[in-house]
């Protein structure tokens, strides 16, 4: 078995029993694949018929109203972005690229129109059609400098859906939902009448739609009902039994009697196959029925007197005595009637036609027009155009390929081609037929929550829809321009205005509900955000109206959506996460992978099934036992079939799960022993991992699940090797790899990776990359070269391993509080760096421009000490609350001066008092170090000194970077040919004769560029040198070009908003240690707040003197039912013990053979999965042991983890009691505690709910405008609300004066509080109380009602 570079350094012992069949697919593919299909940026020949290509092809050609011009689409190109991703974030720009569309304008001869089209001219050119945002490599968008994610949406799939309203008997309904266009509903009422609605407007008879489609009343009846023939004579009425098979299963309304008057089948009996045989054997071909039954029937088709041509009755007329007499008079003794006798099926349409007052197609069209356009006079042309535009014109109505596929599949017909996206007559007829079948109990209604009826709309599709909206507006503009512009040589550019496209796309990305500010607390929160599936948003549900069924877990979620990870609160169940192995198919339906079972043998062939396909199969669980030949061991197996859990014979199984973790999401798959936790707590655990703050130094979890490396790899925060090779150079900013050209099959000799340093994330956490490789290390493609934030050796590391004791300690762990050891604070375990961005904007005001300057009136020298001459803080300055970051003055209006002030001004030449200090200051409660300053200015006033200094520093840094990069390339090229050329014979060289041998000494005198000018006699060597020469020259040109581009980008002027003269951004790094009040959590939903940080000497300690790090309340476990944390603590303790064992071996000996024995015992004595230690050389073994001293990392995958026996065995090897308990001593007294305590290692996280961000106290601040009460909340620097219950408390104590103070001078008594301030300044202790402002507000509101209420100032004594 081969291990990657990072794995060799620290192999994780794995406990899973199940075989590894399929790798977890790339976690961000739902984002990247969707947008790749939309951009479709391949060359025109290889383009898919989707995304931009599809929209442009559907929208063009555009024809002018008079037919003289036609604009055709030919091709499109996506240009290069102006700035790269990093530059866009710095400048606050959008990472996008121009879309240029090649359009062909065809001009026809005006004279020949409209009879024929004679081409007069064809003009073709590329037209700019707006900017399209590009997706970064990690699946995000940079919009106005901030990273955003477009969340995928789960919405109802286009197609037809049948449902039942439980509130009314027989109220079945059908709804045809298109991808875009009008909805069409059909519904039954309690009387059995079928109604139709268009776009949920007023209902009308369903037969009106059929008539509008061109069907006559007779054709409608013929299509939806059977007919029977009744003959009549003097004896009575007889019903012909011509088609007995169609009557099978129906309840008879009459007796069937043979010629001898024997009853063959009795009335009210359900007709069976045996009965039909009896009737046929008896030779009965008709049966007598009475007039009461005949009078309930209706005529099946128009009855016409053939002799006179007179219409005796119309189709659907009731059979009456008069009608029968008229038939007899006309010589007709047989009558074709609608079959209500053997079946009720025909009655629904017949009854509906009775309600329908329209007679023909024209009347039906008018009726529909009246419903949709009430009040408009119906004109013949507009009536027909409206109806056709509703369902039959592709530009206005489209089922899309999904809708057409679903409609055909549901109706069970392939009559309509898959390429027809509008409705056909047969679709509407088929839907009504199926609805009647369901009403008759012959069909099933649809489950709307089944994932076969809900599809995922990903980012590419949403942007495509926005682009289509914008293009539709452009299309209208083109038509108008064609008719208005009168130009001899009209070109496509003259008639295309791309602004609507840019506006539509900008609106979607900046203010769309599904375009969200990326959650960037840690790599997991990024990955989870990109894999989120929301049922909310435009075209989706609203959280107020969503019921319990929609939110609940459905059987089809298995392997597609995670049943665990969803938010708590109003969005529960509406926002889901994609399961680990799930993918979205071409139609937008979620698919899960399964292993195929052939003839009882489980193969390694993988098939992805959608929820619709899965319903037809029997699927075994991943944990089902198999023998050596992959046959099932047991005869009876637990399986899933049609959404039910069943036990069935192994011979019936068709598929098997791929992995035990395939049902849960990436976040839930990170929780070890998930299977032992209550689902509610796991939900909290999965959600809280996303809130973990990356700490100063990341530490891997001792007990993991094996999913850590997958999440870290796919998050894009680690640097991954593109090619195999050797590390040539490493520092904190860059890693240089000398590429192994044979292994990587590339001509590139050098790979250079730049590291991200101290960058601010969206959540103000710090993104920093650290190299984990050393010079000379050999690496393979795909190896991790550098850790990102919250990763350790390429594994996700959100917290730290702490030694936990489950015991109470003096009430400090009451109600989930956490008692921490001071050692954790000293070791900076949970110290995190937060980077805050402060922005100062200088604007052009009415009174004059604001100015950033160090010359500020009435500010002491000490306050300006940290600023440079431009008035901007120095990088590296330590700033406290209230310190000036950017000094700025704002002009204020001139005021009238007294003669004295004018005199002073004249003497001292003072002009500064007409400006106000509006400097950017450090907010209260914060302090930190300035780590970066950015200055953006418009070009008008020229650049300030600080801006020029920053610009020069950036250019110098870029020059140095590119020079170093080229030096590395040069050294690599040099080393690739040096050994071959020394000692070779020369063909031609300056300073040497032909045939001379090249020496090392001669080469040392030449610069490397001159080496490459030497030619050699050996042809092979000459070719090699020639290749090196070409590569060297190309690299030089490329590096120089990149430097020039970078320089141009640095010097390029900044586009500031109108009225803005200058923007200064100051980045301050704030160090936050853990302290009481901070929130911490484990991975099992076990959260709490730090109550006290205890000195190490006072903490409980073990017999060997090791103090514990944390005390947790044991009462927090039984009621929460998250037992996984106990198992984690036990296994963590075993892991720690194994690490100690390895450390002891290292202290005794550093011989590889001895170390291998210890490692063999540690890794391979327990569990089924073995570690191949022979794959590591002696040096790697030694390195591995050094890295394992703190504990041996263990992977216990979800639903396939370590068993109790395994944990006990490991505890034994680690030298601990198998029950995981031990004797602890009180750190304060040294006495042992009465009982043994469970002690173990648990992985704990610091969450982004820090006390520093929440603690706040108001001194003086702003007041509400209306009530004049202090504002509330930290953001407004507000006060604490003294609410109703607090007032009761003071009343209960009888503290009248304190209460008066609270309600008046400390709140909204304006005059009182200003007097109070004056009295405090003067040293007086009196208090004058006036009327609170809120009382004045109340008084004015009462006056507004016409009641004069006033306050009586007089006292009772007067």
Swiss-Prot record:
Catalytic activity of the protein: RNA(n) + a ribonucleoside 5'-triphosphate = RNA(n+1) + diphosphate
Lineage: Bacteria, Pseudomonadati, Pseudomonadota, Gammaproteobacteria, Thiotrichales
UniProt GO molecular function: DNA binding; DNA-directed RNA polymerase activity; ribonucleoside binding
Family membership noted in the UniProt record: Belongs to the RNA polymerase beta chain family.
Protein name stated in the entry: DNA-directed RNA polymerase subunit beta
Quaternary organization: The RNAP catalytic core consists of 2 alpha, 1 beta, 1 beta' and 1 omega subunit. When a sigma factor is associated with the core the holoenzyme is formed, which can initiate transcription.
One GO term of the biological process aspect: DNA-templated transcription
Main function: DNA-dependent RNA polymerase catalyzes the transcription of DNA into RNA using the four ribonucleoside triphosphates as substrates.
Gene of this entry: rpoB
GO (cellular component) term, any one: DNA-directed RNA polymerase complex
Cited CDD domains: RNA_pol_B_RPB2
Organism: Francisella philomiragia subsp. philomiragia (strain ATCC 25017 / CCUG 19701 / FSC 153 / O#319-036)
Keywords: DNA-directed RNA polymerase, Nucleotidyltransferase, Transcription, Transferase
NCBIfam families, per the entry: PRK00405.1 (NF001616), rpoB (TIGR02013)
EC number: 2.7.7.6
């Amino acid at each position: 078995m081969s291990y990657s570079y990072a794995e060799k350094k620290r192999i994780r012992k794995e406990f899973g029993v199940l075989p590894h069949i399929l790798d977890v697919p790339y976690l961000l593919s739902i984002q990247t694949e969707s947008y790749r299909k939309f951009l479709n940026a391949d060359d025109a020949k290889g383009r898919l018929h989707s995304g931009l290509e599809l929209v442009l092809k559907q929208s063009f050609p555009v024809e002018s109203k008079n037919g003289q011009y036609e604009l055709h689409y030919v091709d499109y190109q996506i240009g290069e972005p102006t700035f790269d991703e990093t530059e866009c974030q710095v400048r606050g720009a959008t990472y996008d690229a121009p879309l240029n569309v090649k359009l062909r304008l065809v001009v026809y001869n005006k004279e020949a129109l409209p009879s024929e089209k004679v081409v007069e001219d064809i003009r073709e050119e590329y037209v700019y059609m707006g900017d399209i945002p590009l997706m970064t490599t990690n699946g995000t968008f940079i919009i106005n400098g901030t990273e955003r994610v477009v969340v995928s949406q789960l919405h109802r799939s286009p197609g037809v859906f049948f449902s039942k309203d439980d509130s009314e008997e027989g109220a079945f309904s059908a709804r045809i939902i298109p991808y875009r266009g009008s909805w069409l509903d059909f519904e039954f009422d309690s009387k059995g009448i079928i109604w139709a609605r268009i776009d949920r407007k007023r209902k009308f008879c369903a037969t009106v739609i059929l008539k509008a489609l061109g069907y006559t009343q007779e054709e409608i009846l013929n299509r939806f009902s059977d007919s029977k023939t009744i003959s009549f004579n003097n004896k009575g009425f007889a019903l012909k039994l011509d088609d007995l098979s169609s009557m099978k299963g129906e309840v008879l309304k009459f007796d069937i009697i043979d010629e001898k008057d024997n009853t063959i089948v009795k009335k009210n009996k359900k007709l069976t196959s045996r009965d039909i045989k009896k009737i046929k054997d008896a030779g009965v071909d008709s049966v007598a029925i009475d007039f009461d039954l005949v009078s309930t029937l209706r005529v099946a088709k128009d009855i016409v007197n053939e002799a006179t041509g007179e219409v005796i009755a119309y189709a659907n007329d009731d059979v009456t005595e008069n009608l029968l007499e008229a038939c007899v008079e006309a010589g007709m003794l047989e009558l074709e009637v609608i079959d209500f006798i053997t079946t009720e099926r025909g009655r629904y349409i017949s009854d509906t036609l009775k309600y329908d007052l329209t007679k023909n197609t024209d009347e039906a069209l008018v009726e529909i027009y009246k419903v949709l356009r009430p009040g408009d006079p119906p004109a013949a042309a507009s009536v027909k155009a409206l109806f056709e535009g509703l369902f039959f014109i592709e530009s206005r109505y489209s089922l899309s390929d999904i809708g057409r596929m679903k409609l055909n599949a549901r109706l069970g017909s392939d009559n309509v081609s898959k390429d027809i996206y509008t409705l056909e007559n047969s679709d509407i007829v088929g839907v009504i037929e199926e609805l009647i079948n369901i009403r008759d109990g012959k069909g099933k209604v649809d489950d709307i929550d089944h994932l076969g009826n809900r599809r995922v709309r990903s980012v590419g599709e949403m942007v495509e829809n926005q682009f289509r909206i914008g293009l539709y507006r452009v299309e209208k503009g083109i038509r108008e321009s064609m008719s208005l512009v009168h130009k001899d040589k009209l070109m496509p550019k003259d008639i295309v205005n791309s602004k609507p496209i840019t506006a539509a796309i900008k609106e979607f990305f900046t203010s769309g509900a599904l375009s969200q500010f990326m959650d960037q607390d840690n790599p997991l929160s990024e990955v989870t955000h990109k894999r989120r599936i929301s049922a909310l948003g435009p075209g989706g549900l609203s959280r107020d109206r969503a019921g319990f069924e929609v939110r609940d877990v459905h059987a089809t979620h298995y392997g597609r959506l995670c049943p665990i990870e969803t938010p708590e609160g109003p969005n529960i169940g509406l926002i889901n996460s994609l399961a680990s192995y799930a993918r979205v198919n071409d139609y937008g339906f979620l698919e899960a992978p399964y292993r195929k079972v052939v003839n009882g043998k489980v193969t390694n062939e993988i098939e992805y099934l959608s929820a619709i396909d899965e319903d037809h199969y029997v699927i075994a669980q991943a944990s089902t036992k198999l023998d050596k030949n992959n046959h099932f061991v047991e005869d009876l197996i637990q399986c899933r079939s049609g959404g039910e859990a069943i036990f069935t014979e192994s011979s019936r199984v068709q598929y098997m799960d791929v992995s035990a973790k395939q049902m849960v999401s990436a976040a839930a798959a990170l929780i070890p022993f998930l299977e032992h936790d209550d689902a509610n707590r796991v939900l909290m655990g999965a959600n809280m991992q996303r809130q973990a703050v990356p700490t100063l130094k990341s530490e891997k979890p001792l007990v993991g699940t094996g999913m850590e490396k997958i999440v870290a790899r796919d998050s894009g925060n680690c640097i991954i090797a593109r090619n195999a090779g050797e590390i040539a150079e490493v520092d904190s900013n860059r890693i240089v790899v000398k590429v192994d050209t044979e292994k990587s099959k590339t001509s590139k000799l050098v790979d250079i990776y730049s590291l991200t340093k101290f960058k601010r994330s969206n959540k103000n956490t710090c993104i920093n990359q650290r190299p984990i490789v050393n010079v000379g290390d050999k690496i393979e493609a795909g190896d991790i070269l550098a850790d990102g934030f919250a990763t350790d050796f390429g594994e996700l590391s959100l917290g730290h391993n702490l030694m936990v004791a489950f015991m109470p300690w003096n009430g400090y762990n009451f109600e989930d509080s956490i008692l921490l050891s001071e050692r954790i604070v000293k070791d900076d375990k949970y110290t995190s760096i937060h980077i805050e961005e402060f922005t100062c904007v200088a604007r052009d005001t009415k009174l004059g421009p604001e100015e950033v300057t160090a010359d500020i009136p009435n500010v002491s020298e000490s306050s300006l000490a940290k600023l440079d001459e431009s008035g901007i803080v120095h990088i590296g300055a330590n700033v406290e609350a209230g310190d000036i970051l950017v000094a700025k003055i704002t002009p204020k209006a001139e005021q009238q001066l007294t003669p004295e002030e004018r005199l002073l001004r004249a003497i001292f030449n003072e002009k500064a008092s007409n400006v106000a200090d509006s400097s950017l200051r450090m907010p209260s409660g914060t302090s930190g170090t300035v780590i970066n300053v950015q200055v953006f200015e418009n070009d008008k006033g020229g650049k300030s000194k600080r801006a020029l200094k920053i610009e020069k520093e950036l250019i110098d840094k870029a020059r140095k970077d590119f020079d170093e990069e080229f030096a590395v390339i040069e050294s690599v090229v040099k080393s690739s040919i040096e050994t071959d050329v020394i000692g070779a014979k020369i063909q031609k060289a300056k300073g040497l004769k032909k045939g001379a041998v090249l020496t090392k000494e001669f080469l040392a005198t030449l610069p490397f560029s001159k080496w490459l000018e030497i030619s050699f006699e050996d042809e092979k060597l000459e070719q090699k040198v020639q290749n090196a020469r070409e590569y060297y020259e190309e690299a030089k040109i490329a590096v120089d070009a990149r430097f020039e581009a970078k320089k141009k980008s640095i010097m390029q002027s900044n586009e500031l908003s109108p009225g803005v003269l200058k923007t200064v951004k100051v980045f301050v790094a704030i160090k936050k240690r853990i302290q009481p009040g901070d929130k911490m959590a484990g991975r099992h939903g076990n959260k709490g707040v730090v109550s006290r940080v205890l000195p190490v000497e006072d903490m409980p300690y073990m017999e060997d003197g090791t103090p514990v790090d944390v005390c947790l309340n044991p009462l927090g476990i039984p009621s929460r039912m998250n037992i996984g944390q106990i198992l984690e603590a036990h296994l963590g303790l075993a892991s720690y013990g194994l690490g100690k064992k390895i450390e002891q071996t290292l202290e005794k000996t550093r011989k590889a053979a001895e170390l291998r024995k210890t490692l063999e015992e540690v890794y391979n004595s327990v569990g089924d999965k073995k570690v191949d230690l022979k794959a590591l050389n002696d040096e790697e073994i030694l390195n591995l042991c050094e890295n394992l001293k703190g504990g041996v990392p263990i992977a216990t995958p979800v639903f396939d983890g370590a068993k109790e026996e395994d944990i006990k065995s490991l505890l034994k090897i680690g030298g601990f009691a198998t029950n995981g308990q031990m004797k602890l001593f009180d750190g304060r007294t040294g006495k042992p505690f009465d009982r043994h305590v469970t002690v173990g290692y648990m992985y704990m996280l610091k969450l982004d709910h820090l006390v520093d961000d929440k603690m706040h106290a108001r001194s003086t601040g702003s007041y509400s405008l209306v009530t004049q009460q202090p504002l509330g909340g930290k953001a407004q620097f507000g006060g604490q609300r003294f609410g109703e219950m607090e007032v009761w408390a003071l009343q209960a104590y009888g503290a009248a004066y304190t209460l008066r103070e609270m309600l008046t001078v400390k709140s909204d008594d304006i005059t009182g509080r200003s007097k109070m301030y004056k009295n405090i300044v003067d040293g007086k202790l009196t208090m004058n109380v006036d009327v609170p402002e809120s009382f004045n507000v109340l008084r004015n509101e009462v006056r507004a009602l016409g009641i004069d209420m006033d306050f009586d100032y007089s006292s009772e004594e007067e």
